Regions:
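Juxtamembrane helix-loop-helix junctions in multi-pass membrane proteins
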Residues: 15-39, 57
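Hydrophobic residues within alpha-helical transmembrane segments
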Residues: 4, 8-11, 35-39, 66, ...
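Helix-helix packing/entry segments at the starts of transmembrane helices
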Residues: 31-38, 80, 87-106
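Hydrophobic/small/kink-forming positions within alpha-helical transmembrane segments
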Residues: 10, 14, 18, 45, ...
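Membrane-interface interhelical linkers
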Residues: 1-11, 27, 40-67, 79-88, ...
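Hydrophobic transmembrane alpha-helices of multi-pass small-molecule transport proteins
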Residues: 44, 120-136
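C-terminal transmembrane-helix exit sites in multi-pass transporters
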Residues: 102-122
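Hydrophobic/aromatic residues within transmembrane alpha-helices
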Residues: 23, 32, 85, 111-113
Length: 137
């Protein structure tokens, strides 16, 4: 099931890039990111209430709160950078650079989460890096 969810995420992320590039034309990139954020917040809380998951908020640990807040700040910074880059650059160049986050995530997961960095991971990172370079040059 995780594979199909990840694939769905990739499809929706691709749609996000195209829809954002069209929608951001003539709009301040920070304002566009804020509008997107409001939509995401409403949708996320709608799903929380629809699935009756709101009761779980009481059992979230202080550590989880800290890391969820930090993750939210990182998401906000990412979206602000992404929207500005998308506004001034070509989607076909901005999106591949943005997807270097895969490589950065693998490296950070190795350093901070002590996840395995296998030969396959290294080769994959190199291929993603080389592919990104090929797409943006």
């Amino acid at each position: 099931m995780w594979f199909w969810l990840a694939l769905g995420s990739a499809v929706f992320a691709a749609l996000t890039s195209i829809l954002a590039k069209i929608g951001i034309e003539g709009v301040n990139s920070n304002l566009a990111a804020a509008i997107r954020t409001v939509v995401v917040v409403v949708m996320a809380w709608g799903i929380v209430f629809l699935t009756n998951a709101q009761g779980g908020i009481k059992s979230i640990s202080q550590r989880s709160w800290i890391f969820l807040i930090l993750s939210g700040l990182a998401t906000g910074a990412s979206w602000l950078c992404y929207y500005k880059a998308l506004q001034v650059g070509e989607a076909s160049k901005v999106v591949p650079i943005d997807k270097l986050s895969v490589v950065i995530t693998l490296v950070l997961a190795f350093i901070f989460l002590h996840e395995q960095f296998t030969a396959k991971s290294v080769i994959g990172c190199l291929l993603i890096g080389a592919g990104t370079l090929m797409m943006v040059l």
